[in-house]
């Protein structure tokens, strides 16, 4: 996300996830100990990986009501700006990074577009993923004409799996606010 130029990070967490907040907090005890022991190189490594003050925000999802609900919980922090969603359980390793490519694509479109990163999966595994139905193709981009979360075997509209990287416009919050619950009683983003 840093490679893509993201400057503010918002984490939506649930109950018993305070360790995530602690991870991104400044570890002044460790810094003090390293200084006392003359470990300047280690202090520099800590400083390089430490987010700037105010660059990280946390909000709580009070109940596990799905990804759409988690995104909606961040609405007051996001405000009226386009934003990225990065799911931590999906590791996407590309050079340049997936999110950087998506932000560059969004900028090149020059319009308010929502982007979703996808990856082809074997047809026999589509029932395990959120899958996009696609329409018109333009290079590496497809127009999405539908999405289905974990379709029944043999019913997927394509083999393009949603990989947990999104560029979204703030208008999505109004849609999520009135979204009906879907699979598993959750408010889905897909």
What do the predicted segments below correspond to?
Residues 1-41, 61, 97-104:
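N-terminal glycine-rich phosphate-binding loop and ensuing alpha1 helix
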Residues 5-7, 79, 143:
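Short loop/turn motifs at secondary-structure junctions
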Residues 15, 86, 94, 167-168:
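A conserved hydrophobic position in a structured secondary element of the catalytic/binding core
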Residues 16-19, 70, 98, 102, ...:
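General structural feature for long, well-ordered alpha-helical segments within catalytic domains
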Residues 30-32, 42, 46-134, 177:
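Conserved beta-loop-beta/alpha segment of the NTase-like Rossmann-fold superfamily
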Residues 84, 107, 137-190:
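Catalytic-core segments of class I nucleotidyltransferases/pyrophosphorylases
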């Amino acid at each position: 996300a840093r490679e893509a130029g993201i400057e503010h990070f918002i984490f939506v967490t649930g109950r018993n996830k305070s360790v995530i907040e602690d991870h991104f907090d400044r570890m002044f005890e460790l810094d003090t100990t390293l200084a006392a022991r003359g470990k300047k190189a280690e202090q520099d490594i800590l400083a390089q990986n430490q987010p700037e003050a105010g660059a990280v925000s946390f909000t709580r999802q009070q109940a596990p009501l799905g990804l759409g609900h988690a995104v909606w919980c961040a609405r007051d922090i996001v405000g009226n700006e386009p934003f990225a969603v990065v799911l931590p359980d999906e590791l996407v390793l590309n050079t340049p990074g997936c999110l950087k490519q998506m932000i560059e694509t969004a900028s090149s479109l020059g319009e308010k577009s929502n982007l979703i990163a996808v990856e082809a999966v074997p047809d026999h595994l589509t029932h395990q993923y959120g899958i996009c139905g696609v329409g018109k193709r333009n290079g590496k981009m497809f127009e999405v004409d539908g999405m289905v979360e974990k379709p029944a075997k043999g019913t997927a509209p394509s083999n393009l799996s949603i990989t947990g990287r999104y560029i979204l416009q703030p208008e999505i919050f109004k849609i999520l606010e009135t979204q009906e619950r879907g699979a598993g009683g959750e408010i889905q983003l897909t």
